[in-house]
A protein has these predicted regions:
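Anion-binding (especially nucleotide phosphate/pyrophosphate-binding) glycine-rich loop
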Residues: 1-119
Length: 119
């Protein structure tokens, strides 16, 4: 788990605003997410859960905790049904591209949508 204080969100918003947050926590597994949730208290509120930051407009520093998932991975659960499981930190457009490369069609119209899967 990556836990930082007074963290710049410059690389986490597509508007490119150089704002900071009081605390930034990035988890990369379900277990880390569970540990994080168990450790949160009132000083972390209001929580802000972000993905790629494409729908995020912060004009000033965020006074609390920002949470970001870095869970990666893609797996086919049922090829015949086109059922895929992916980590919440995967970039959505990359999932669409991956699906096409693996002959799993149907999500093509969702291409070029910014953001991450679990945002």
């Amino acid at each position: 788990m990556n836990d930082k204080k007074n963290f710049s969100l410059l690389g986490h918003n597509t508007f490119g605003f150089n704002v900071s947050c009081k605390r930034f926590v990035e988890y990369s597994s379900t277990e880390e997410a569970q540990q994080l949730v168990a450790s949160l208290d009132d000083t972390d509120k209001p929580l802000l859960i972000i993905g790629g930051g494409s729908n995020l407009l912060l004009k000033e520093d965020y006074p609390a905790t920002v949470i970001h998932s870095a869970i990666r991975g893609i797996e086919v659960l049922d090829k015949a049904e086109g059922l895929v499981r992916c980590g919440s930190g995967e970039v959505w457009d990359d999932i669409v591209d991956w699906s096409i490369r693996h002959n799993l069609y149907g999500a093509e119209n969702l291409s070029i949508i910014p953001g991450e899967v679990g945002a």
